[in-house]
Amino acid sequence: MSHIFAENGEKAMRRILMIVFLALAGHLLNGQQLPGIELIMRLEGVDSPEDLDSYEVERLESLLDRPLRINHASLSKLKETGLLSHYQAVSLIDYRSRHGDVLSYSELSAVDGFGADFVERIAPFISFESGSLPGMVASDLGTSHEIAVKAASKTVIGSLETDPAAFSYALKYTLSDAGPFAAGIAFANSYDGRGLKPETVCGHIRYDLKRARGKIVAGDFNARFGQGLALWNGMSVGSLATPSAFLKRSSGVSASSSFSGAYALRGVAADVTFGRIRFAPLIAFRHERKSASLLPAANVSYFGRHGQCGITHYAEFSMTSERTSIPDMKTSADFAVCLHGTDMFAECAYDWASGSSAALAGAVFPVAEDMRMAAMIRFYPPGYSPNRSAAARSTTKCTNEHSVSLSGEAALGGWLDLNGKEGFGSSVRRATCTFSLDAACFPETKEGEDPRDIQLKANTEWTVMLTKAFRLKSKASERIRTWGQPFRTEIRTDLTYMSDPWIATVRLDAVCSEGFGFLSYLEGGYKTSKMAFYMRQGVFLVDNWDDRIYSYERDAPGSFSVPAYYGRGVWTALTGSWRFARWGRMYARAGLLTYPFMQKKKPGKAELKLQFIFYI
């Protein structure tokens, strides 16, 4: 009897949600805006949200909510956001000291090291807030505090077993703009956690050095140098779908206080600049029950007017009760220069433990006024250790790969003025096209007895503004390889209606590999500066795991979700946020996933999330 009531309740809930959804989708007005995830995609140079990393999304979502105040930020703050390279940050500081605060996008585009295209990509993440007269430098705004609290509950439905609901929580506190000091700490417990004791703790204390133009960080931090071939902790975008993804902008040493803290190093690090030379020493440690590790590292970089070069070295000491060893040690040299609009970069690294060398080199260059391309070659021998490496790659690790990549993007047609927009960024090209090709040879076979394996990937995407409100995006990709399933073809189309304050999207996605997979959803939403509400209703028919389809799901900041849909089912998701005061915002998400079309019964799940962020 309880099972019957559960099914009736589920149907009633879906009926109510669909009524709300259709009511929202029927009230489209005029105007236009881009969703936050698309702004992040454009900055990172990816063509789909499924290619993004959760840590990067969390970091950039916080900047969308509270943009970087470039007229108040120190050199350390400008660099650690990852928006600007070291040269751009130094150039901006120098411009502010000579000419005063930057007050417009056009003025920022004229600063040495910037440009209109780059400023357009970072525009949503920065603020020109200034309390000074033109030509003067902004003063400090005072201390700010940010507190984020979130809780979630998940339960299995439609199962004969009575499993208790799983519970997770997270808490984060950030102190900033407190003179030279900044600090942050985060606690988190996942669904698999036992009790209320946090599974992960991540925090830092940062002190800015004014005379040396640098900082000291104690606690959890990130160390990212060169193009990521030797030392780049944390995940990075491996996809090379657009030219913007080829060249990495290393942030050096930066503090970390993410909810997960999974990728951060823990220890003490410094980042100081003397003239054109930056020196970044660090030491990180990790302690477990029966072993411990120590990681000393250093980077020295020189920054010129047209580029930079640097040397990075680290060694990992592994210590047990029996012996001490050095399982991982690398040295690398890198450079990046920009000449006449062409970016050229390279990095080579030597793995002392295996005695193997790895290298990459590439360029991003204009072909015509409205077209640019990028090319890269990579040589990663099988013996090269992928530990702490996050360079561009064709698979998941920077090892056992000889590859070449090519990508291009072009703008077609005239300019289209967007409704409700004025000034910088108020118009877009009617059509844009991107393509990418990637060919890789793996010296050590992945499977079988062949001496080597080969993989080819091709991708193209078209974005067309049909009107001032309707946008059509079509993407086609093909992967061919000599192991596993030899072919994987995917075709995806998104039709979006963006009309302030409303938005609606229809997605159709088909995959052909082992069999055939299909996914589609209809989403409607409402967004203003004070509140936002989205509802998504989707269906998927995927009988084979190799045909699985990934789909980005909206969530609260710090909760990036890209589930793989497999089976035959439907899902409904409600996501909303409300700025109830100048100092606070609430986020909520409710999701329901069931499998009514499966021949063999499969339990679904229901999930509820709630998150508060307070600004003091």
What positions do the PLM features span?
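Outer membrane beta-barrel
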Residues: 194-251, 255-281, 370-386, 528, ...
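Short, Lys/Arg-enriched N-terminal segments with co-localized hydrophobic residues
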Residues: 2-12
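Amphipathic, charged-and-aliphatic alpha-helical interface segments
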Residues: 54-103, 117, 122-126
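Transmembrane beta-strand segments of Gram-negative outer membrane beta-barrel proteins
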Residues: 135-163, 175-185, 216, 244, ...
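Alpha-helical interaction/regulatory segments in DNA maintenance proteins
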Residues: 47-61, 106-141, 225, 372-374
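Exposed, low-structure sequence patches enriched in small/polar residues
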Residues: 162, 166, 296-298, 302, ...
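Sec-dependent N-terminal signal peptides
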Residues: 16-25
